Design a protein with these regions (language model features):
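C-terminal tail/sorting-segment detector
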Residues: 225-235
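Residue-level detector of functionally pivotal "anchor" positions at catalytic/ligand-binding pockets or at interdomain
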Residues: 191-213
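Sec-dependent N-terminal signal peptides
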Residues: 6-15
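Short, glycine-/small-residue-rich phosphate/pyrophosphate-handling segment
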Residues: 131, 136-169
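N-terminal beta1-alpha1-beta2 submodule of the flavodoxin-like/Rossmannoid cofactor-binding fold
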Residues: 21-106, 115, 182, 186
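Glycine-rich phosphate/pyrophosphate-binding loop and the adjoining helix
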Residues: 14, 162-193
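Positively charged n-region of N-terminal signal peptides that target proteins for export
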Residues: 1-6, 235
Length: 235
């Protein structure tokens, strides 16, 4: 009897670690004005995810100066030769292994109806490694529509498993981003992997314990597998 219980415990632990390893999310973002950085901060207050910021290799560039001359030049170079690595601006090296993640959420600004050039560089270099992974897209812009950015993403990550909806956060609704992100996560069924609508807790919030069906427990749980503050634990 003891050996059976021990074997069951080991199997549960292996399942737990396997689930955590295969269901990880990476949020990749580039931010020039700071809007995308704010979006990522709000997003990661609602989900458990690692974060990777894309940085240009050359610092201090003013992409909007002289009538957006530099930004336009970078995008035109990509348009002219989209399959040539030399067409893309250099970015800082990244130390993330995409094999560790099941889901990639890309947060990028829109530049003149296209994806920001620096994010295009990252996806040109690593988009092939996203094949078969869940891919989400959050786009920040002043007012323009996002179809060009979506097209750029699908060109650079052709074999990603895209969520059913993309999220567009513009100047007029940026302050309402928390509600928009929460609704988007629901629309794409992001939380179905755990069956829990929301488990991320702030440091000031009391601990919440759920069973595996997503039900909040109001009493001290008995022995078993539960989720506390977004993480599985065994009591």
């Amino acid at each position: 009897m003891y050996m059976k219980k021990l074997l069951f415990f080991v199997c549960v632990m292996l399942t737990w670690f396997h689930t955590d390893a295969t269901a990880k999310t990476l949020v990749v973002y580039y931010s020039y004005t700071g809007n995308c950085r704010e979006i990522v901060a709000t997003l990661t207050s609602q989900i458990q995810a690692d974060v990777l910021e894309i940085q240009p290799a050359e610092k201090g560039l003013k992409y909007e100066a002289n009538g957006y001359a530099l930004g336009t030049q970078l995008l035109n170079a990509i348009k002219a030769n989209p399959n040539d690595a030399g067409s893309y601006p250099a970015i800082d090296p990244v130390a993330t292994t995409l094999d560790d993640y099941e889901t990639i959420i890309i947060v990028t600004p829109l530049w003149w109806s296209q994806m920001a050039a620096n994010m295009q560089t990252f996806l040109f270099n690593y988009g092939g490694q996203m094949a078969g992974k869940n891919v989400g897209l959050i786009i920040s812009s002043a007012s323009s529509g996002i179809s060009g950015v979506v097209a750029d993403c699908k060109r650079l990550v052709p074999d990603g498993k895209y969520f059913s909806e993309n999220l567009w956060i513009n100047h007029s609704n940026h302050s309402n981003r928390a509600t928009l992100i929460q609704a988007w996560l629901t629309d794409i069924n992001y939380h179905t992997v755990t069956g829990i609508n929301e488990t991320k807790a702030t440091t000031t919030a009391p601990s919440r314990i759920y069973d595996l069906g997503g039900r909040l427990l109001v009493e001290e749980p008995s022995k078993g597998l539960y989720i506390k503050n977004g993480k599985k634990f065994i009591r």
